[in-house]
Amino acid sequence: MNKQKLLIVGGGGMVGATAAYACALRSVIEEIVLIDRNEDLAWGQAADINDAMGIDRNVVVHTGNYSDINDDDIVVITAGTPQLPGQTRLELIDVNAKIMRDIVKNIMANGAKPYLVIVSNPVDVLTYVALKESGLPKNRVFGTGTTLDTSRMKSYLADAFNVDSKAVDAYILGEHGDSSFSTIETAQIGEVPIREYPGFAEEMIDGIEQKVRERAYRVIETKKSTYFAIGFVVSKIVSALRKSTHTVYPVCSLAEGEYGLNNVVLGLPSTISSDGVKILAGYPLTEREKESLNKSAGIIAKMISHLDKAENC
């Protein structure tokens, strides 16, 4: 029986390499394989990470190819193209959907049944593409969803209330994009409702979603891209996939009836374990949050419909 390993498609890029580095630092898996069209760059990233592990090495990082994928391996896909000046979002979706289809075809070519974790953007739509192209069960294909958005919000609230971010219980849900929304109305710090927490002021949470987005935009403006935060998110997800503890993160996977949604992929509270992903049904949402969820789902559904029509033309 093959030992489970992590393979990162796009491992030569900053997101893929940083995800590999985070996984290696945290020792979440023993073998990491970087796959990239630029084989020299992938080799350099793998060598650099291995050198970092030299003093206390319990993880091996190396380059490889699609034929290295076996049943139950974890394949993280970070490859894709960024949005160009003047390019519409639908045009970007068309380009990255083609890239995703080609990657998934290569992944599935040897008949293995891995887990697919999508990081490439727009992550909700590309997760749908990967699921459809792979033919894998829906519990084996999911994206990072709004996990990074949630991490940003928890970091912001932890600073505002001067608490450990682990004490903050709140999510950003929906699209990993401009229609995302927070569950701030039912948020808690420890087990205390946020509005009852000592020192609470309404301005602390007013417009929290926009503040989270502006934080992301500011990071991109100053350093062109984000990779440390999403790399760490990937390491947490990979770790959860290797355990039976059913860790909850707002990843994106196919909804089939949950929260009244069908045939749409977006960030929802979900359990992740060695059994894969499962949407956590029944998470309490306010009426405002339900409206926001349906609005976000509608936006993603239109993008999915656009892709389905384009593919059938």
Task: Please identify what each model-predicted range represents.
Residues 2-6:
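Extreme N-terminal starter segment of soluble prokaryotic enzymes
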Residues 16-17:
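N-terminal Rossmann-fold NAD(P) dinucleotide-binding loop
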Residues 54-115:
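Rossmann-like NAD(P)-binding element
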Residues 89-154:
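Rossmann-like NAD(P)(H) cofactor-binding subdomain of soluble oxidoreductases
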Residues 134-140, 149-313:
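C-terminal substrate-binding/catalytic lobe of Rossmann-fold NAD(P)-dependent dehydrogenases
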